Structures are given as C-alpha cells and as structure tokens.
Amino acid sequence: MSNSSPETVSQPSQEVKYGEREIAEGQLITFPNPRVGRRYDINITLPEFTCKCPFSGYPDFATIYITYVPDERVVELKALKLYINSYRDRYISHEESANQILDDFVAACDPLEATVKADFTPRGNVHTVVEVKHRK
C-alpha cells in the first residue's frame, strides 16, 4: 500500500487552443502560379474530412479529392487543410459540403477547371460519393 496521495486530474482549460484558433481564423490563401500559361493538373487528397449530419447530428467522415488546373493563382496547402478542418463541427449534408468546398475554392483561386470529389465513409450500409465540377 502506498502512502502517496492520489493524483488530481486537472480540468480542461476553457481557453481556445492554438489549433482551434487557426482553424477558426483560417481562410483559403493563394499565391501566384509559377507557370502561368502552362496547363497542368494539381491533385490534392484530404483524407480526414469530417462534418455532422444535419438530420441526425452523427459525424460523417470523408476523403476529399480536389483536382484543378490553375490559372493565375495556386492554393496554399496549409490554408486548405485548416479550411477543410473548419467543417468538423458544421451540420451540413454530403451534397452541400462538396458544392460549398468547390464554390469557396473557385472563389479563392479562380482556376481554369476544378473538380471536388467527396467520398464519404459508408454509414448505415450507404456509401455516398459526390463529385462537382467547375470550368471557365
């Protein structure tokens, strides 16, 4: 038997964590395309997308695939990651999330072409894949 007193468990701090602050402040940031005039594809995979079902409140998980042909601007990847993380506590349907991501992406970098594919993890024996496209 030990004479030491039991450890106290500290309560979580109510202050906003730096990661939460970065996500809340996050915006899609772009920089100049280093090869304007050359047509090339950029493929991005974001395997940890989460949001909440607007009907049940249950979490939904997806892999987001973004493919785009840049024009004059390219999206900065850390900013994109933080933007995607901002959906974590948002109540939004599969269809609306894919469309909103595409709308915001196009507004930020005005690509020649862009496709957002949201491949949701099956829930209740239903597998949903939403693919939306933009072309100038």
Curated annotation (Swiss-Prot):
- According to its UniProt record, in which pathway does this protein act? tRNA modification; tRNA-queuosine biosynthesis
UniProt binding sites for substrate: 75-77, 94-95
Instruction: Please name the SUPFAM superfamilies in this protein's record.
Output: Tetrahydrobiopterin biosynthesis enzymes-like (SSF55620)
| Gene Ontology cellular-component annotations | cytoplasm
Which InterPro entries is this protein grouped with? GTP-CH-I_C/QueF, NADPH_dep_7-cyano-7-deazaG_red, QueF, QueF_type1
Q: Name one GO biological process term.
A: queuosine biosynthetic process
Q: What is its EC number?
A: 1.7.1.13
From the UniProt record, list the reaction(s) this protein catalyses: 7-aminomethyl-7-carbaguanine + 2 NADP(+) = 7-cyano-7-deazaguanine + 2 NADPH + 3 H(+)
What GO molecular function annotation could you give as one example from this UniProt entry? preQ1 synthase activity
Which enzyme class, named as a word?
Answer: oxidoreductase
Q: What top-level branch of life does the organism fall under?
A: Bacteria
Q: Where does this chain mainly localize? A: cytoplasm
- Annotated active site residues, numbered on this chain, are 53 (thioimide intermediate), 60 (proton donor)
> What are the entry keywords?
Cytoplasm, NADP, Oxidoreductase, Queuosine biosynthesis
Q: Where in the cell is it found?
A: Cytoplasm
List, alphabetically, the PANTHER family matched: NADPH-DEPENDENT 7-CYANO-7-DEAZAGUANINE REDUCTASE (PTHR34354:SF1)
Annotated family: Belongs to the GTP cyclohydrolase I family. QueF type 1 subfamily.
Task performed by this protein: Catalyzes the NADPH-dependent reduction of 7-cyano-7-deazaguanine (preQ0) to 7-aminomethyl-7-deazaguanine (preQ1).
Spell out the NCBIfam families in the cross-references: QueF-II
Family matches, as HAMAP family: QueF_type1
Q: What is this protein called?
A: NADPH-dependent 7-cyano-7-deazaguanine reductase
The organism is Trichormus variabilis (strain ATCC 29413 / PCC 7937) (Anabaena variabilis)
Q: What gene name does this entry carry?
A: queF
